[in-house]
Amino acid sequence: GPLTILHINDVHAAFEQFNT
């Protein structure tokens, strides 16, 4: 996601998808 304070949330969401 964009380089923002919520960028951590974006990364977390991506990991959640990989974590099936």
UniProtKB/Swiss-Prot annotation:
UniProt keywords, alphabetically: Apoptosis, Cardiotoxin, Cell cycle, Neurotoxin, Secreted, Toxin
Gene Ontology molecular functions: hydrolase activity, acting on ester bonds; metal ion binding; nucleotide binding; toxin activity
Stored InterPro entries: 5'-Nucleotdase_CS (IPR006146)
Subcellular location: Secreted
A single GO BP: apoptotic process
Keyword Cell cycle among record annotations: yes
Cellular component per GO, a single term: extracellular region
Tissues expressing this chain: Expressed by the venom gland.
Purpose of the protein: Toxin that shows cardiotoxicity on isolated guinea pig heart and auricle and neurotoxicity on isolated rat phrenic nerve diaphragm. Shows antiosteoporosis activity in experimental rats. Also induces apoptosis against human leukemic cells (U937 and K562). Has no effect on normal human lymphocytes. Apoptosis has been evidenced from damaged nuclei, cell cycle arrest at sub G1 phase, increase of early apoptotic cells, augmentation of DNA fragmentation and also a reduction of telomerase activity.
Protein name per its UniProtKB record: Bengalin
